Amino acid sequence: EDFGIPLILQSTVIEVHGDERLEAVTIAQVDEQWKPIPGTERTIECDTLLLSVGLIPENELSNGAGVQLDPIANGPKVDDTMMTSIPGIFACGNVLHVHDLVDNVSKEAERAGSFAAQYALQQLPAAARRVKVTAGENIRYVVPHEVSLDKPVEFFMRVQKPQEDVVLDVGGLRSVKKQFVKPSEMLNITLTPEVLSQLSGDTLTVRIVSPKEAGRQ
């Protein structure tokens, strides 16, 4: 509560009050499907309501080309070369998923550009093995959606709900302790080919778990 301003999480505005000017808002807690929970309503007097409704990737070109989209991230599904489901079409930046930092957009663009150039020159090597990447417990989405095991891969993801004192686990191959996670802050983690090659199955699941659960792996 910086400066005495309370932070109310997992709640939404369900009603605004006032005739010629705003006088109050009614808020309510929401469930895991983000639907208001009856009986949790409370009214707060105020004269200003600021809305931050988020960003949605613009994908008219992707839709027109028939690129397969991630229904959660609202961007194209890509592999670790940033190639979409249509060979020769690559995606990066906010068209792929909404980023927090322009630094990550720039790095992603360089990566996509490099692989696109290799593809155009017919120098992009075919992967000997690919695995699907899936979002597990408390992970809303993860990018990329498919990876090979022969190059370093940086994964980006967002959580579904805030949690404290947890562990970010990537397929049981690597775990990182997190003091807290929240949907508004993107998480990222890089796995080397040496680590990725230890995967035994054909699916890599990214999830948020408790330290105790992570210790049982």
Tell me the role of every PLM-derived stretch.
Residues 47-99:
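FAD-site-proximal beta/loop scaffold in flavoenzymes
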Residues 5, 18, 30-32, 51, ...:
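Generic secondary-structure signature for well-ordered alpha-helical cores
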Residues 183-192:
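Aromatic sugar-binding surface patches on proteins
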Residues 92-144, 212-217:
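A conserved FAD-binding loop/helix module that cradles the flavin
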